[in-house]
Regions:
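Short, Lys/Arg-enriched N-terminal segments with co-localized hydrophobic residues
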Residues: 1-10
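TPR/TPR-like alpha-solenoid helical repeat scaffolds
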Residues: 52-55, 87-93, 112-127
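Charge-rich, low-complexity segments
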Residues: 116-187, 193-196, 203-434, 443-450, ...
Length: 462
């Protein structure tokens, strides 16, 4: 009857309230006893999930997994089910499997703080350093097949080749972009993602000796002076027929680029702009484009002083050298100084007055409470961190002594730990009114901590 159905719903609500009350009080055994008292045949999806949660909370992760597997068909599109699967696998040290479930939970219910934190912790426990080594092991194991793909390209379906190679680059992270070409060239692509300029060079650095004489790996597209034709948006565009002008700003040390090509300029503005940027990156290379091109706009006619796109790379390099500037294509090689007004704030870094960095966007995000770059780096198993130590700011002379100590310690960490063991990069440092800071990008957090703690213990005064 309808009254019986209503009574069952009320009883279910009372049951849920009781279970939630016990869970909040950490009385998970009571939850287990109650739900185990219901026969499996009568336990629904929700009751089974709550029982699995209780087993997770008492550390019986294998039992939780068995229960969750029994409701997989319904659970795969459920946030809680995916979270609980990830939770059990995480505490069984099965981090890669756990990561896939937490990632799915995040897709289903974005921005849950617990899910995001578990994703971060999973990534840290699958460090970039070990991912890189796994990729190279895969590449060496499959080198013969990869060579055949280069030598007999016409015999391979491109989609099949891409899927095969994605098995290897997928060991590094999801959505790694690459291109494999003639002459055994393998090029990773940063696709405008700044953090990859700091990660991919290490990937190339770890290439096994057995591959070095034959294969040519690039951390990002290096550019070319050779012209070619590109099919895009139904157009066949010859690079020689794309005309450009580059105006140099010596204060900013960058270029504003304008372009004209009849077909490109007939496209809607967003399409034309996007198509040109693809061409420019291919010709200039991703490093030069990212470092030195600050603005791109199209013109409605061929203007005086314009020249063919293939000559742009040479023009930029010559202009920089003529102005006494060193040509540095990777942003990680360029350090800049910055000054800030110290703030009254108990949180670290808000006391900073002056610093230097080769990753300005990351430093900015520290103060914006923005984790975008932090999470993008974490996605690869790397970690942006800073070490801080307090000091007594009693005089300018004492501050100089502290600054000299920071420089010496940075040098020591870089030479003895980062360079020797390939554990990361020094990104810069800063001094504030209360603390000193050293910024790092780590390729293996656990490995770094194990090495750096004995060094830091040598300086008990800090």
């Amino acid at each position: 009857s309808i009254s019986n159905k209503i009574e069952n719903i009320i009883m279910d609500d009372k049951l849920k309230q009781q279970i939630n009350s016990w869970t909040k009080a950490n009385e998970d055994r009571k939850v287990i006893d109650l739900l185990e008292g219901i026969s499996p045949a009568e336990r629904g999806f929700e009751e089974t999930g709550l029982l699995a949660r209780a087993y997770n909370y008492v550390g019986e992760y294998e039992k939780a997994l068995v229960l969750l597997e029994s409701i997989r068909e319904v659970g795969e599109q459920d946030t809680n089910w995916n979270f609980r699967m990830g939770y059990a696998l995480y505490y069984l040290d099965r981090y890669k499997e756990a990561l896939s479930y937490f990632t799915k939970a995040d897709e289903l219910t974005p921005e849950d703080v617990d899910t995001i934190e578990f994703i971060r912790q999973c990534n840290i426990r699958i460090p970039f350093k070990s991912r890189v080594d796994a990729f190279w092991a895969w590449f060496v194991q499959n080198e013969a097949e990869l060579s055949r793909m280069v030598e007999k390209r016409g015999e391979y379906d491109s989609e099949t080749s891409i899927r095969f190679i994605e098995q290897g680059v997928g060991l590094i992270a999801k959505n790694v972009h690459f291109n494999i070409g003639g002459n055994y060239e393998f090029t990773f692509s940063v696709e405008g993602e700044a953090h990859l300029f700091y990660l991919y060079p290490y990937l190339i650095y770890r290439m096994p000796e057995s591959l070095r004489d034959k294969w040519h790996f690039f951390p990002y597209n290096p550019g070319t002076d050779c012209s070619f034709e590109l099919k895009i948006y139904g157009l066949d565009i010859n690079m020689e027929e794309v005309y450009v002008c580059a105006k140099y700003d010596d204060k900013r040390n960058d270029f504003a680029v304008s372009f004209y090509e009849k077909g490109l300029c007939s496209l809607p503005e967003n399409q034309g702009h996007g198509a040109f940027c693809i061409m420019m990156e291919i010709m200039l290379g991703e490093g030069l484009s990212y470092r030195y091109v600050s603005k791109v706009e199209r013109t409605d006619r061929l203007e005086e002083g314009m020249f063919p796109l293939p000559a742009l790379r040479g023009y930029i390099v010559k202009t920089l050298k003529d102005n006494g500037k060193e040509v540095l294509e990777n942003p990680k090689d360029v350090f800049v100084s910055y000054q800030l007004d110290p703030e009254e704030n108990d949180e670290l870094r808000y006391d900073v007055a002056i610093g230097s960095t080769n990753f300005s966007n990351l430093v900015s995000q520290y103060y914006e409470n923005n984790t975008t770059l932090f999470d993008k780096i974490n996605h690869y198993g790397a970690q942006a961190v800073f070490l801080a130590f307090p000091y007594n700011n009693i005089s300018a002379e004492h501050q100089k002594t502290i600054l000299d100590f920071r420089y010496a310690l940075e040098d020591r960490i870089e030479k003895e730990i980062l360079d020797t063991d390939g554990l990361g990069l020094l990104l810069g440092g800063a001094i504030g009114t209360c603390c000193c800071y050293m910024d790092f990008l780590l390729y293996d957090v656990k490995g770094f901590i194990e090495k750096v703690l004995p060094v830091l213990r040598e300086y008990p005064q800090y």
